[in-house]
Amino acid sequence: MTNIRKTHPLTKIINNSFIDLPAPSNISAWWNFGSLLGICLIIQILTGLFLAMHYTSDTATAFSSVTHICRDVNYGWIIRYMHANGASMFFICLFLHVGRGLYYGSYMFTETWNIGITLLFAVMATAFMGYVLPWGQMSFWGATVITNLLSAIPYIGTNLVEWIWGGFSVDKATLTRFFAFHFILPFIISALAAVHLLFLHETGSNNPSGIPSDSDKIPFHPYYTIKDILGALLLILMLTLLVLFSPDLLGDPDNYIPANPLNTPPHIKPEWYFLFAYAILRSIPNKLGGVLALIFSILILAIIPLLHTSKQRSMMFRPLSQCLFWLLVADLLTLTWIGGQPVEHPFIIIGQLASILYFMILLVLMPIISIIENNMLKW
């Protein structure tokens, strides 16, 4: 009798994706982040669902409803902080996942890579709108500043901003629609993640060497299921430690002050995971130029496959490219630091230099160094 796992239409999909899937024998812990992102998404959807049961998307009661969740709802505080810090864990995993893709040349699977970029944009949009919902000072002013950037679009900009706001400022209509979008987007992300996996399974996974591994595959279960469970346990441990010991470590104290349109906070800044893009935005004195640089700082990932000039796929055997990659990581950390600093000397010039370096590495230095490495190897 044939195993039902391999014949039933539903279990067959699960079997071919998570059990009998042929996987490279040498993929390292850097390949764990896909499953960790799936776990993060599930945590966010579940905690978000329970928060939505008690939250009210009205300017008069939004802040109070969040306070009510933390004070009066059974274990409401843990649900709220799991959700807030879960977003941080989500972005840590995202950045490491994208970094792995850049380092090992996984971007050569262009369909998978492009859906990944779409997912990144969707998660960033979701996180931004979620940050607005508690209706604290940073929620209100963050929403005002970021949505206002659209007014830089020639001709239609002002109308577009007022259309998104649902009025002439960030108000009740804005909060209500942001809540609606924040609720629906994770389900769209889930569907996109399924398509991401679909395209990945068309080609099979890449591996650290960047060499095709068709001749040496092992079943996903039990080898990588065990490995993923270990990663999941470490992720949950880190999240639990963060939630129980320092839940406000990554948040902004200003968000404990109810939103007040008449009082601007001294330093308006987004959550830590947007600071690198915010620094790039601020480093350009022109509004439209800043917005374009902001968008392109993420969209640049889409042209990475076109800029791949190396004869090797992975950076595993390319020390010069490795040096450039880690310079890029250091540059992004510098941008993250600058994004959280006030707009004054010397932070302005450091931010501008770091922004130039970011685009220089990806657009100019990486392709040139790859060609030099090809010549050094006489390829």
UniProtKB/Swiss-Prot annotation:
UniProt-recorded Gene Ontology molecular function terms: metal ion binding; ubiquinol-cytochrome-c reductase activity
Residues engaged in binding heme b b562: H83, H182
Keywords, comma-separated and alphabetical: Electron transport, Heme, Iron, Membrane, Metal-binding, Mitochondrion, Mitochondrion inner membrane, Respiratory chain, Transmembrane, Transmembrane helix, Transport, Ubiquinone
Domain of life per record: Eukaryota
Binding, a ubiquinone: H201
Keyword tRNA-binding: no
Subunit structure, as described in the record: The cytochrome bc1 complex contains 11 subunits: 3 respiratory subunits (MT-CYB, CYC1 and UQCRFS1), 2 core proteins (UQCRC1 and UQCRC2) and 6 low-molecular weight proteins (UQCRH/QCR6, UQCRB/QCR7, UQCRQ/QCR8, UQCR10/QCR9, UQCR11/QCR10 and a cleavage product of UQCRFS1). This cytochrome bc1 complex then forms a dimer.
Note: Heme 1 (or BL or b562) is low-potential and absorbs at about 562 nm, and heme 2 (or BH or b566) is high-potential and absorbs at about 566 nm.
Family: Belongs to the cytochrome b family.
Functional description taken from the UniProt entry: Component of the ubiquinol-cytochrome c reductase complex (complex III or cytochrome b-c1 complex) that is part of the mitochondrial respiratory chain. The b-c1 complex mediates electron transfer from ubiquinol to cytochrome c. Contributes to the generation of a proton gradient across the mitochondrial membrane that is then used for ATP synthesis.
Name of the molecule in the record: Cytochrome b
Organism: Mustela putorius furo (European domestic ferret)
Gene that specifies this protein: MT-CYB
